[in-house]
Amino acid sequence: SFPFADESFPFDDTALVFKVHGKMFALLSLDDQPARINLKNNPERNIELREEHDWIIPGYHSNKRHWNTVIVEEYASWELIKEMIETSYKLVWQKLPKKVREGSV
């Protein structure tokens, strides 16, 4: 769990959204098999990840420059997925206004 993160279903009952102070850092599709999760990353890193792993594709219904969709296959690297979730959270956290970040401590 991440500080000040919460989850909700703002779109429908199959898209679980994770936010920090109202800003999305992950979207998990619950009705897809295998599961899919959209995560934010740096544009250059997104390109690298897509080239290295066929289970990472441009973000579905997202800005494809900044977001990836991770297809959670059984052969997917759980360590990499955890790292990507953490990176997504940190990138969104860093974009929050300073007064929000400092008021959250």
Where are these predicted regions, by residue range?
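Charge-dense, helix-prone N-terminal extensions
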Residues: 1-105
